[in-house]
């Protein structure tokens, strides 16, 4: 049996592993959540949260021996279970740790590519703590202690990727620290729901929607794209020569390498200047937002996910669901395209970015939705205030959803 004292020790160790943030690129850390606006006379009933994972190692490596050595102290304790019945764990008597072997990884050191770092886990501990202050202490949406009953009102989904699963574990650990777990009832289990990548809709998925791949490819034939290629050719040649690489990995991969390096106060690769980093980011972001600027690409990419979010709200309002705290743990390709649907994406989503869709009601059971993104509340199109009447939000959302989605995804004659 794992005692509460052991859980508390694990929690404190993970806090110690955190790395303090100095002056770094915006990409390194999203702003913290803030209190909601215009809440007088209203009660918070439900919230859905979409997050990007925390700080991670790069996804791209130059494979040069001069690359920085990455040290990943964040472990992963786990136990297999033959019993999937919801409830509490009362018979856990040992844990297993997954360990990356030194110098057998993509980078020098003991880190896999794209692995959540100790800093990344700390960022989601911090996010969970901030959300606890809002949704437990301030708005009393959730109880102060995690019991089996409380766990039944929480629903969690993650992409089936270690860094997103570990990020949401950090989020939930700080939302209900081990000291707030109801004693004598075992360890409450919170399912982290995942799905096969083929069906994943938390990010734009051309496998799920083949037409999306066609439309994205078509963006590379436009005059604007041709001008972009011309304007960035010299930068591309300079960066490749500086890094000593012969195959161009793409702007976003280079941006990721440079920003991940700076987020850990590592030196940039020899010859790479801050001006070069800035230009690489500008090229990566232009390409990212340009393709999402085509309405049908934006809508096809996130339509079914938005539909799930809307359905969750309807189920709660209609009384067919009692789940009131829903977390989606995803990527930049989750947060960016989702906020883009509402015209709110203005930069690349930083690590630990977060979107909150809060459902409020007045004493007459009139419902309102407040849309919050990285610490700011927004007035959505079709709404007159940050507190948007729920029917107005539904109208806006349904104008974004793609009708006959399956047909649209197989329509090779569709235009932007």
UniProtKB/Swiss-Prot annotation:
Belongs to the histidine acid phosphatase family. One of its GO terms (biological process) is negative regulation of aggregate size involved in sorocarp development. This is Counting factor 60. Disruption phenotype: Cells die quickly. GO terms for cellular component: extracellular region. Residues 1-22 form the signal peptide. The keyword Transcription regulation does not apply. CDD domains: HP_HAP_like. Glycans are attached at residues 110, 218, 231, 318, 411. Keywords: Glycoprotein, Secreted, Signal. GO terms for molecular function: phosphatase activity. Its main location: secreted. The lineage of its organism: Eukaryota, Amoebozoa, Evosea, Eumycetozoa, Dictyostelia. It is found in: Secreted. Gene3D superfamilies: Phosphoglycerate mutase-like (3.40.50.1240). Component of the counting factor (CF) complex, which includes cf60, cf50, cf45-1 and ctnA. It comes from the Eukaryota.
């Amino acid at each position: 049996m794992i005692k509460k004292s052991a859980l508390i020790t694990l929690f404190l160790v993970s806090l110690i592993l955190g790395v303090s943030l100095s002056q770094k690129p915006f990409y390194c850390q999203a702003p913290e959540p803030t209190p909601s606006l215009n809440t007088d006379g209203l009660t918070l009933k439900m919230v859905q949260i979409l997050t990007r994972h925390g700080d991670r190692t790069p996804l791209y490596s130059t494979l040069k021996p001069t690359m920085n050595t990455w040290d990943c102290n964040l472990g992963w304790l786990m136990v297999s279970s033959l019993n999937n019945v919801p409830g509490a764990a009362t018979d856990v008597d040992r844990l297993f740790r997954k360990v990356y072997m030194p110098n057998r990884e993509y980078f020098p050191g003991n880190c896999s590519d794209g692995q959540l770092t100790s800093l990344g886990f700390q960022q989601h501990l911090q996010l969970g703590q901030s959300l606890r202050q809002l949704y437990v202490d301030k708005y009393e949406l959730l109880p102060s202690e995690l019991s089996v009953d409380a766990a039944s009102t929480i629903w969690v989904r993650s992409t089936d990727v270690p860094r997103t699963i570990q990020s949401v574990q950090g989020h939930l650990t700080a939302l209900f620290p081990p000291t707030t777990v109801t004693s004598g009832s075992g360890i409450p289990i919170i399912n982290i729901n995942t799905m096969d990548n083929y069906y994943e809709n938390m990010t734009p998925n051309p496998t799920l929607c083949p037409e999306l791949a066609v439309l994205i490819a078509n963006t590379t034939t436009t005059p604007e794209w041709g001008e972009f290629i011309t304007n960035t050719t010299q930068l591309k040649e300079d960066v490749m020569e500086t890094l000593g690489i012969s195959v161009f990995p793409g702007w976003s991969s280079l941006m990721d390498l440079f920003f991940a390096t700076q987020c850990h106060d590592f030196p940039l690769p020899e010859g790479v200047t801050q001006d070069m980093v800035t230009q690489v980011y500008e090229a990566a972001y232009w390409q990212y937002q340009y393709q999402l600027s085509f309405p049908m690409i934006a809508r096809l990419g996130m339509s079914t996910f938005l539909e799930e979010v809307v359905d969750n709200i309807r189920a709660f309002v209609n009384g067919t669901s009692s789940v009131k705290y829903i977390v989606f743990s995803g990527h930049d390709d989750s947060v960016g395209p989702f906020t883009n649907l509402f015209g709110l994406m203005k930069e690349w989503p930083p690590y630990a970015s977060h979107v909150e869709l809060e459902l409020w009601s007045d004493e007459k059971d009139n419902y309102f939705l407040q849309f919050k993104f990285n610490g700011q509340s927004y007035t959505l199109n079709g709404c007159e205030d940050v507190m948007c009447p729920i029917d107005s939000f539904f109208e806006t959302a349904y104008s974004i959803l793609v009708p006959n989605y399956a047909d649209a995804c197989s329509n090779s004659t569709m235009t932007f």
